[in-house]
């Protein structure tokens, strides 16, 4: 019987990262989305192309063997597909997980297969599958919760691949960097074993992979974006061509490296090599990635467990240095009223209407007695003072 994966999110990451590797692994992919335009395009097209870009050139793969369902109008079809699938993945954004959970819960509840469904959230957030699992349990009858592990297993993942903004006329085709990393927990699958997806690096402990990725790739990428935006740069490559900004990114990643090395017992040499790889990757001019795209959704990016406050708070607790991370936070807080970015508008409103300490709590989620908190308040106060 053919393997089937149901994937929520027909966007660039869904088509260009997750679906590409599911397709390569021999799965039929069923895309689920609420965007009429994406679903219609997928339904009316037999294939699309994923072009991997590197300094060595380009390589194009053709993706076929997929279907698409609009969950807004055909939820029962989505439930039926999940009930007979091998894998469910998603790349919808952490804030959307609660909206896709009801259909997944119903699909899981309808399963009769001997092997449980593998559920893997592919989001830029720590513990995203745990979050989705929580929402699914909220949408499952109490008397069915105890037997849910017979029907589904949930594994957190760490994904790493840069998907830049796409050309307006690209249609379903996706340009994407060649490099990728997709690490997924293996332990939740127990005696059933994990699904067969060669692109996945199966690990027993995911936290080192998630934190190393989030606090290096995402921290460095966002730092370049926010400093670049405030310096009038157009692309990430242009920002990193500026020796001042490149030096700042290195300083920030030196701080996060000290945390990663100390906490996860990764060698300094290995982490330094990883940092150099990341800086080379995000400097790639062929990706043509804009500072606005990488910087979008600043409120999520300055939140408690994210790329700035996450490492800075842990460094503060350990007595480490976090001054450069505070600089990144400041630049992120100056990413206000950017066209097409609702969070940047809301950010400006919060900073305008709240006292520094109140704004710091609301934006970062830090407790007022946390050792990092007074330093964050000082940054917020400085940004607010400049706006007066």
From Swiss-Prot:
| InterPro entries tied to this protein | 6-PGluconate_DH-like_C_sf, 6PGD_dom2, Mannitol_1_phos_5_DH, Mannitol_DH, Mannitol_DH_C, Mannitol_DH_N, NAD(P)-bd_dom_sf
Binding residues for NAD(+), per the UniProt record?
5-16
Which Pfam families does this entry report, sorted A to Z? Mannitol_dh (PF01232), Mannitol_dh_C (PF08125)
The record's GO molecular-function terms, alphabetically, read: mannitol-1-phosphate 5-dehydrogenase activity
Active site residues of this protein: 213
Lineage: superkingdom: Eukaryota
Which GO biological process entries does UniProt record here?
A: mannitol catabolic process
Task: Kindly state which reaction or reactions the protein catalyses.
Answer: D-mannitol 1-phosphate + NAD(+) = beta-D-fructose 6-phosphate + NADH + H(+)
Enzyme Commission number(s) from the entry = 1.1.1.17
Q: Name one GO cellular component term.
A: cytosol
Gene3D superfamilies linked: N-(1-d-carboxylethyl)-l-norvaline Dehydrogenase, domain 2, NAD(P)-binding Rossmann-like Domain
Any idea which UniProt keywords this protein has?
Answer: NAD, Oxidoreductase
Q: Which NCBIfam families match?
A: PRK02318.2-5
Relate the protein's function as given in its record: Catalyzes the NAD(H)-dependent interconversion of D-fructose 6-phosphate and D-mannitol 1-phosphate in the mannitol metabolic pathway.
Query: Of which family is this protein a member?
Result: Belongs to the mannitol dehydrogenase family.
Quaternary state and interactors? Monomer.
Would you tell me the protein name for this molecule? Mannitol-1-phosphate 5-dehydrogenase
Q: Which organism is it from?
A: Penicillium rubens (strain ATCC 28089 / DSM 1075 / NRRL 1951 / Wisconsin 54-1255) (Penicillium chrysogenum)
Phylogenetic classification of the source organism = Eukaryota, Fungi, Dikarya, Ascomycota, Pezizomycotina
């Amino acid at each position: 019987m053919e393997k089937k994966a149901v994937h929520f999110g027909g966007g660039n990451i869904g088509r260009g990262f997750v679906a590409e590797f599911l397709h390569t692994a021999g799965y039929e992919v069923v895309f689920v989305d609420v965007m009429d335009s994406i679903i219609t395009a997928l339904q009316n097209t037999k294939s699309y192309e994923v072009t991997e870009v590197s300094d060595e050139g380009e390589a194009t793969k053709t993706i076929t063997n997929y279907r698409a369902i609009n969950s807004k109008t055909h939820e029962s079809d989505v439930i039926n597909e999940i009930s007979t699938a091998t894998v469910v993945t998603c790349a919808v954004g952490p804030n959307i997980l609660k909206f896709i959970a009801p259909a997944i819960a119903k699909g899981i509840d309808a399963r009769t297969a001997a092997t449980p469904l593998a559920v893997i959230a592919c989001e830029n957030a720590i513990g995203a599958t745990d979050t989705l699992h929580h929402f699914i349990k909220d949408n499952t009858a109490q008397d069915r919760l105890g037997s849910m592990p017979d029907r589904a297993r949930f594994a957190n993942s760490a994904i790493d691949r840069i998907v830049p903004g796409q050309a307006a006329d690209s249609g379903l085709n996706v340009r994407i960097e060649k490099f990728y990393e997709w690490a997924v927990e293996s332990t939740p699958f127990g005696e059933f074993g994990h699904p067969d997806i060669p692109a996945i690096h199966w690990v027993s402990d995911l936290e080192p992979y998630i934190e190393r990725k989030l606090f290096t790739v995402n921290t460095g990428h966002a730092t370049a974006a926010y400093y670049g935006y405030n310096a009038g740069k157009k692309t990430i490559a242009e920002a990193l061509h500026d020796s001042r900004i490149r030096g700042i990114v290195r300083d920030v990643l030196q701080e996060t490296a000290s945390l990663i090395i100390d906490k996860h017992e990764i060698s300094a040499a290995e982490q330094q090599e990883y940092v150099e790889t990341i800086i080379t990757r995000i400097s790639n001019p062929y990706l043509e990635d804009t500072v606005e795209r990488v910087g979008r959704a600043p409120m999520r990016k300055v939140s408690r467990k994210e790329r700035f406050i996450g490492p800075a708070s842990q460094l503060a607790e350990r007595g480490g240095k976090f001054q450069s991370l505070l600089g990144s936070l400041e630049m992120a807080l100056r990413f206000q009223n950017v066209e097409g970015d609702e969070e940047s508008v809301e950010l400006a409103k919060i900073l305008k209407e709240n006292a520094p300490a109140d704004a710091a709590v609301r934006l970062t989620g830090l407790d007022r007695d946390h050792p990092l908190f007074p330093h964050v308040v000082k940054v917020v106060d400085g940004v607010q003072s400049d706006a007066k």
